[in-house]
Amino acid sequence: MKIFVDTSAWVALENKKDTHYKEALSFKYEIKNKRYRLYTSNFILDETYTLLLANIGYEKTIEFTKIVKILRNKGLLHVIQVTEDIEDTALLIFERFNKDKFWSFTDCTSNAIMKMIDVDECFSFDRNFEQMGFIKRP
């Protein structure tokens, strides 16, 4: 099974003060047990690194970047690079749906990527993914 990991999940896993920390940790073990294939994007990691730096500090953020590197090197995490084609698709999504919603451009790139790689589950605490028609976990 495949699952896309959103910024809110990464932050919840790393920030013990996050309101979703315990829930995220519990779901992390489910991911391991069910052997999900993890996907995220360079845009998601950009957001995550910035938020972690602001909320948990430099040292812990650098530790997290090293964990990401290890997961990538072991083939446990696939980081999709947002290309110009993905950006173009994301912009169409952004323009079409934000008349009555508030989806960040990064969320729109995630939407485009998830459709491109045929992933319908997202590890996230962001309700936008349900609005987009994906299954939000946990």
Where are these regions (language model features)?
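Short beta-strand scaffold positions
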Residues: 5, 39-40, 81, 105, ...
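Active-site neighborhoods of divalent-metal-dependent phosphate/nucleic-acid chemistry enzymes
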Residues: 77-120
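Short, well-structured N-terminal submotif of metal-dependent ribonuclease cores
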Residues: 1-40, 53-66
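Acidic, PIN/NYN-like endoribonuclease modules and their adjacent C-terminal/linker elements
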Residues: 111-138
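Short acidic, glycine/proline-enriched helix-loop-strand junctions
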Residues: 67-83, 87, 98-100, 129-138
